Amino acid sequence: MGQGVLRGEGHPNNNPNSKVGWKSLVGIITIFMLILCDQSDGKICYSMDIRNNISQFSMLEDCTVIEGHLQILLMFTSKPENFRGLRFPKLTTITDYLLLFRVYGLESLKDLFPNLTVIRGTRLFFNYALVIFEMVHXKEIGLYNLMNITRGSVRIEKNNELCYLSTIDWSIILDSVEDNYIELNRDNKEECGDVCPGTVKGKSKCKHTLVNGALVERCWTQDHCQKVCPSDCKGSGCLPDGQCCHPECLGSCRKPNDPSECTACRHFQNEGVCVTACPKGSYQFQGWRCIDFNTCQELNSRCQNSRDNSCPPYVIHKGECMPDCPSGYIANSTTRTCTPCAGPCPKVCTIFQNVKTIDSVTSAQELRGCTVINGSLIINLRGGNNIATELEANLGLIEEISGYLKIRRSYALVSLSFFRKLRLIRGEVLEAGNYSFYALDNPSLRQLWDWHKHNLTIIHGKLFFHHNPRLCLSQIHQMEEVTGTKGRQDKNDIATKTNGDQASCEDNLLTFNFIKTSHDMVLLRWDAYWPPDYRDLLGFMVHYKEAPFQNVTEFDGQDACGSNSWTVVDMDAPERSADGKTQSPGCLLRSLKPWTQYAVFVKTLVSGSDEGRTYGAKSKIIYIRTNETIPSVPLDPFSVSNSTSQIILKWKPPSEPNGNVTHYLVYWQEQPEDSDLYEVDYCNKGLKLPSRTWTPPTEIDENGNENQTEHTSVNKCCPCPKTEFQIQKEQDESAFRKTFENYLHNEVFIPRPVRKRRDLFGVANGTLPDPVTAPPLFNVSSTRAPDEPEPKIYSQKVWFKESVLISGLKHFTGYRIEIHACNHELSMGCSVAAYVNARTMPEATADKVVGPITYEYVEPNIIHLKWQEPKDPNGLIVLYEVHYSRVGGIEEVITCVSQKQYNTDKGGKLRVLTPGNYSVKIRATSLAGNGSWTEQAYFQVPDHPHSNIVKIITGPIIAVFLLLIVLVYCVVQKKKDAEGPAGPLYTSSNPEYLSASEVYIPDEWEVPRDKINLLRELGQGSFGMVYEGIAKDIIKGEPEVRVAVKTVNESASLRERIEFLNEASVMKAFNCHHVVRLLGVVSKGQPTLVIMELMAHGDLKSYLRSLRPDAENNPGRLAPTLKEIIQMAAEISDGMAYLNAKKFVHRDLAARNCMVADDYAVKIGDFGMTRDIYETDYYRKGGKGLLPVRWMSPESLKDGVFTAFSDVWSFGVVLWEITSLAEQPYQGLSNEQVLKFVMDGGSLDHPENCPPRLHSLMQMCWQYNPKMRPTFLEIIDMLKDDLRPSFQDVSFYYSDENKPPETDDLEIDFENMESTPLDPSSCSLRDQSSRTNIYEEHIPYTHMNGGRKNGRILSLPRSSPS
């Protein structure tokens, strides 16, 4: 079982000054072993401090819960390979906090703690539950199963390699993110190319969430998404399929809705089951689990047997096993339960080591509420504000002291009346073996108690009063009478000369004969002194204080209020041997500051002699300086690069020089680039290119303010001066950072002795390294190839200044720099390092491809280009761009060659179809950006050597084959003509004599005319009027249903009638709730009717405009809310996703072509309803077909390319229409201006009052690169958590049809899914003309156009307005 270092709160080992015997330590360990073994599975471990050696990780073996904190820190020699194979998958919960600090080589926690789910934060580290600080090699956090930080915040700071921070949504893990502090990491420098799972392949796998107005994909690493559960789960966690865990779970579970399968519990865990409260017979323990009564009692028994007074006496109270009873309750020693007090609650306070010194208000507060002191009290108050009131508030309830009460050198005390309830001093333990009340050297003490009102009994022991010059003897004699101690005292116990007098005599001079110093201690010895009656010598008082200048007097800093700037150490009088020889008395002054001058003097403390004289003695004030020691770390290191080979480094002196800082040691080492970048194909347009930045040159003034140098601000405005509020805020943040760092260093650095000695000067040293005689503890990350030598470490000494110019560096190279402060005592070593990362500036020509570009004709139509890689690029080359075009031609082609492909081919391969002479130029892209283009080179693509022979042989064969196809076609066509016309083809030389029935064959969709009754006109469509009607028996189970009936005008031509029915034929293929459904066709007789699903609220554009406040036809509804807009967007996306799955491309998605049903559901509209109504929304480009340019994507406007991605662009415009209540897109621009604006990369502005979430979705749809736009299914995935439950029942997204394809025939190629309608003219020779011409002349816009389906092309109607 893993067991941590026992350093929890309240543990005696936390106090470096505590002295706990080995028996006590064994008892303490036994108690915590009981806690560990209490669980049947043996998986609970206590707080752990893993430091210095990686072998200490073995303590974590088999731990499931750490009941306490986990600190991993200070490993300077570990390397990445040391952590490979270290894995603790059982650890799921930490009850306090997780701290990581300066662990070299640790790059990620994904393998170390793959299942850590909950950090409870019961006790925090400076208000933080997760601290990651100065992890020099960490690249990612990687806690991909972390779902809940119950209490506290997150602090991630000064991790120069740490990425994947902007891809984490902390609001999912924490209740509040306002107090998080995430600064000074690589992520903040925009250097991270964070790639979430699936991004490389263009198929995002991770969910998107909205933070600060940005909709971002969420992941922990390139292999692990951040787990985002549905909002219904409310923090309980969920399974991968989205099923919520039981409400009592916290973070995760193994089965849904099962409290026994939780990873962690929201409230309490009882025998493996999560419960709201512990059941009867069990008790809450440590805030998260239940234990039985016997276990709690056993904890208390073990604690008592340990003989450790600080061990808490566990009791049962209100269903909880706790260390002590709360205020207002007292523990029953038999049952170990808490019972309410009758009146003021007696509270027995047991004093650690039997003596408690009250030397400050803070120490007095520790006894607040105590009524019985089981031990002795020493009052030693040198000063303070409002001290009497504070003492009465904290000590005023004490009624009984079992030992003695000693008032010593309390300059601030005038009276002891603050002990207002003190009634009994038992004297079970006596001071100096005799005294139960001891008052010594209290110059302001004038009154003990008001003896007329106060009663005090002293059972054992005597009184002792000396050197209380303002305390009258009458007060002392009266105390003898009241307390019952009269007659117990000897004549020397109460000094008649030094109590109540205002004088003190020190006639003799004491001389120091031995002085020895260390960095924090001084040992003093002085000549022995005895008064004539050696019994009058009570002891010595050694006074000392810091003295920067040698002008101190004894009475500096003392006043009538008791303030005293001197620190006083009391020393007992030495024992007097029989022969009268006495060892020189001495004193060891501890806890001094290094390299600090102190003023010191010593004086005797004597009683008055029988003759009335006081035989005192005092030394002169001497000045002693403590020794130097290792300085503290240099402050605020700052680095800039002013050229391609230099870095300017500045810092501030250490806050504690601990000597005269003479010089600094500066070490620097080149940091290799991340070799993983070679493995990623950055030619994939879905990936962001990695980058590295350098800090532009700046100047730092004397106050530490940064000013940009002149050459960086050319042609730029000067920065505005900071306001007082900004300056104050920066100062507060800086002060808080320093406070946190001081707290961190104080907590994690545990002093340890360098050597052991038997004398008083066993000086303790910290965990700092030995004297620096070797290079520092640099550690190279695993980004370096195994066979690559480790970069050399360089060093330089910097004398008497805090800056250095490091020269001779490589261009655009990262360096890790360490700065050590050294003082004149080099044998002690130099300080812990302050480190900073810097990068030199890029070389302008380093990324240029030099040398000739050669080519090789490897196979037909493939050219292998070869070129030399830049010898010394700026960082790494990530890709090459090859720009080539046919000489004299117009079309230019740019192709991308990844570094990985270049390493394989030593160049790139081009597929060139057309023979001819070509020009080519190449440029490289490095971590610093794009290099420059090479000079143009030329290559020739020849005709295939055997092309003429092939043509001679294959020509006749092809001609014969085509002739056979024509003959077969004619035979089949003749047979069809004999059977009668069918399908969309017609060949009549005079089509006006044909009726619709001759080109349309009735099928199962045919509806008898007498089942349709027309009620009223709805509006004019493309072919004729549209009516509302009643249809009988056309929907199973519904005798009558309201429908929309489309008609064709009587004056319509035969072609228009054919197109009218063809549109109906196309819609027969659709069966989706969010696409308007065809219900039937009446083709027999005139007029021809098409029966459609009735959309009661008309088209979406008209409906939105009716919701405007000033609209005359406003139905009384308000503008749609955010939730309603999201519902509309999902319904439109669902209909479009269905059409994409059917391999149809819409090409004209707009609000006018969406319909609103009676229940306000939005559906993709039917055909022919809106072309004439909204003809102004279309534009006739070059006299050709009508184009909806304001809804078209850039690639559609440029090249006539229509794909599912171009429909997504149009969907973004529809969203804009919904939020603006159907305003015209690009209002104020003409159609020609819109064409140019969009093709140049423009898009619509932010709509007024548009929520950030919707605008982020619009921007995703308007990505210029089509591949960067989301699919309609991905859009629904982003919105699904906010949709109505009914959406799951009716949508295509949740239907069985929306499943991954099982065969290649069903795969959708979104990039090539172009809309290419066929009509008689499309089979002409004009197919060989440019795609743009075909688009302009032969593809008019319809509301729904077919694409490829099952290997054939559906002919589509031409519904251009005449």
Curated annotation (Swiss-Prot):
SMART domains: FN3 (SM00060), FU (SM00261), TyrKc (SM00219). Disulfide bonds join 45-63, 163-192, 196-219, 206-225, 229-238, 233-244, 245-253, 249-262, 265-274, 278-290, 296-321, 303-311, 325-338, 341-345, 349-370, 472-505, 683-896, 822-830. Residues 973-1362 are cytoplasmic. It catalyses: L-tyrosyl-[protein] + ATP = O-phospho-L-tyrosyl-[protein] + ADP + H(+). Residues 508-629, 633-730, 849-944 form the Fibronectin type-III domain. Autophosphorylated on tyrosine residues in response to insulin. Residues 759-951 are extracellular. Residues 1-37 form the signal peptide. It is a single-pass type I membrane protein. Keywords: ATP-binding, Cell membrane, Cleavage on pair of basic residues, Developmental protein, Disulfide bond, Glycoprotein, Kinase, Membrane, Nucleotide-binding, Phosphoprotein, Receptor, Repeat, Signal, Transferase, Transmembrane, Transmembrane helix, Tyrosine-protein kinase. Residues 38-184 are annotated as: Leucine-rich region. Residues 705-714 have a biased composition (Polar residues). Glycans are attached at residues 53, 115, 148, 332, 374, 434, 455, 551, 627, 642, 660, 707, 765, 779, 917, 930. The chain crosses the membrane at residues 952-972. One of its GO terms (biological process) is positive regulation of MAPK cascade. Receptor tyrosine kinase which mediates actions of insulin. May be required for forelimb regeneration. This is Insulin receptor. The gene is insr.
